[in-house]
Amino acid sequence: MTTEAKCPFSGHAPAASHAFGGGTANKDWWPNQLRVDLLNQHSEKSDPLGSNFNYRKSFNAIDYDALKADLRRLMTDSQDWWPADFGHYGPQFIRMAWHAAGTYRTGDGRGGAGRGQQRFAPLNSWPDNVNIDKSRRLLWPIKQKYGQAISWADLLILTGNVALETMGFRTFGFAAGREDTWEPDNDVYWGNETKWLEATRYSGERNLANPLAAVQMGLIYVNPEGPEHAHGDPLAAAKDIRETFARMAMDDEETVALIAGGHTFGKTHGAGPASHVGADVEAAPLEAQGLGWASTFGTGKGADAITSGLEVTWTQTPAQWSNFFFENLFKYEWVQEKSPAGALQWVAKDAEAIIPGPTPDSPKRRPTMLTTDLSLRFDPAYEKISRRFLDNPQAFAEAFARAWFKLTHRDLGPKSRYLGPEVPREDLIWQDPLPTATHKPTEADIADLKAKIAASGLSASELVAVAWASASTFRGSDKRGGANGARIRLAPQKDWAVNQPVAGTLARLEEIQRASGKASLADVIVLAGSVGIELAAKAAGTTITVPFTPGRVDATAEQTDATSFSVLEPVADGFRNYQKTQFAVPGEVLLLDRAQLLTLTAPELTVLIGGLRAININADGSQHGVFTSTPGALTNDFFVNLLDMNTEWKPAGDIYEGYDRKTGERKWTGTRVDLVFGSNSILRALAEVFGSADGKERFISEFVAAWVKVMNLDRFDLAAA
């Protein structure tokens, strides 16, 4: 009898790769294969709660006071399996919440706390997140008690808030509304590095690639020891801090407040060499049950814990709010030292041992700082702010409270998504505030407006183009953009190159809106798109009514941070066959990125491209991809003609030309975005559905459904109602 493990799939040599999902994958053969699958992630098939679950309703029924009371009790309920430093879990819960939210970046709105992604790879195993798994596990009894009444995403942030409150800090408020996902966000680009803490993301003189907002793979922001090329240099570190925090929408004052406020509490952990630390969460053995980084150094916990390898405690009261961070920062001169793990840090010169250790029997130690802490003293701009906070602790507390709220709510979207009794009343400019609706047009008003729009002399393509330009700025990542607010008429959107072709149409619609006085311009723009589609369908011999839900409002310039909105400008919009410039990234990849931000599925992407090409809303007015003899009519001709084997395609510079195989006559021109629907096997399969003889009716109905979805992506007020 043999005990050798056998492969159940072959009966021959054991091989784990023979198992389900193993073996050579498509991506191994074709590493540049288009990731159409990313449009279908987070489907109902992965959601255990089902499509009928209403998180808003579930959270609103929670006993919020009881939940917070349970969290307060947890803060000092130290567990033997992972004891609390200084007898209080608050500092590690602040780190947990910060690192959940701190992955957000403005470039594409991805990352952040809004989806509970810290539970999944790669975030759950990042080097910067060592031992945060313990914090989430400490929370499990509370999450188990309240179940789906509060999401993990909300609980992580609320726990950080309660941690601050139990340590004597007054927070700015808290809003729930983050719904959990059940698998990793595989669409997020975290970098190309293949080893943790590598940094191949820079070019030239330290130009960080967009949309990244961290200096190394596996870090939230910056290396606390300083840049990899300048360890121990606070000024070099300050440059990294300024860039990474700016890419998370933080200015200098917010940056100083966040770093100092966070480092008022707790400590870092570097009691011994990293060689004692085991595998991360994803690589840990089965019996570890989702806990990583098991340590063989001493007890592996408490005073023996190892996380970053740095061993720094900033203040005399690490479990209580104070101004000691700034007092210590400026009181002492600082000299470099190595932590017990060998990491570079700083210790106060000639200081007394006034800093407590993490356990009651720990000896006191001298004040210590990170290189990035010293940046707040030695960078001239940061120093000015730091000294003001040193002299005015109340200003520091106010700045930290607001910056913490912004950090933890930046990707939650507009206030209409906020839930709970602690939502601040104040409107903040970064929330992209909207005025309250004062009038909702009646059905008669809408009918009158539709008639005026139809009689305006504007073509179907012009009407559809302006509505698309307004609505397609939406990003499902951070819930910004969209048609509500009609910000297409304000800076910076009115000045974007991609929007110049719709300027005349917009001006005409503004005239109609002012003359009517019965609807917002935001509603009129979307309604114009509906009219355009109905006209295009009529031109194709079909009578339809595009669903329209009024209630949008018009934002003012004072409610619009032009600089903040600049990141929403599309560098490419394949739906309009637009690219601002030539990129190393193929156009079809940029198209999928845009589609994913619009929360479109692959079928929705496909049908929208076909319909918008038939109507012809190309930003430059070209005929690329307009594979029809009746442009402006809502036909499925794009698919029929793209799939026609009588056409032979040839590259011609940046475009492609389609020739009749028999006559050699040039019939069409198209871009990579157009031709990918015949080239990519998945997209071609979808195109065949809409290009079939029985696909015309399906094409129109699915196009209208996808169109209405895009127009309503930012109508969070409807869900709230």
UniProtKB/Swiss-Prot annotation:
Cofactor dependency: heme b
Top-level EC class: oxidoreductase
Keywords, comma-separated and alphabetical: Heme, Hydrogen peroxide, Iron, Metal-binding, Oxidoreductase, Peroxidase, Signal
Signal peptide stretch: 1-15
Gene3D superfamilies according to UniProt: 1.10.520.10, Peroxidase, domain 2 (1.10.420.10)
Cofactor: binding comment: Binds 1 heme b (iron(II)-protoporphyrin IX) group per dimer.
Superkingdom of the organism of origin: Bacteria
GO cellular component: cytosol
Cross-link Tryptophyl-tyrosyl-methioninium (Tyr-Met) (with W-98) residue location(s): 221-248
Active site, per annotation: 99
Site (Transition state stabilizer): 95
Record-level Gene Ontology MF annotations: catalase activity; heme binding; metal ion binding
CDD domains: catalase_peroxidase_1 (cd00649), catalase_peroxidase_2 (cd08200)
InterPro entries given in the database record: Catalase_peroxidase (IPR000763), Haem_peroxidase (IPR002016), Haem_peroxidase_sf (IPR010255), Peroxidases_AS (IPR019794), Peroxidases_heam-ligand_BS (IPR019793)
GO biological process, one term: cellular response to hydrogen peroxide
Annotated crosslink Tryptophyl-tyrosyl-methioninium (Trp-Tyr) (with M-248) location: 98-221
Family (UniProt): Belongs to the peroxidase family. Peroxidase/catalase subfamily.
Role, per record: Bifunctional enzyme with both catalase and broad-spectrum peroxidase activity.
PANTHER family recorded: CATALASE-PEROXIDASE, HYDROPEROXIDASE I, BIFUNCTIONAL CATALASE-PEROXIDASE
Protein name in the entry: Catalase-peroxidase
Native organism: Ralstonia pickettii (strain 12J)
Lineage of the organism: Bacteria, Pseudomonadati, Pseudomonadota, Betaproteobacteria, Burkholderiales
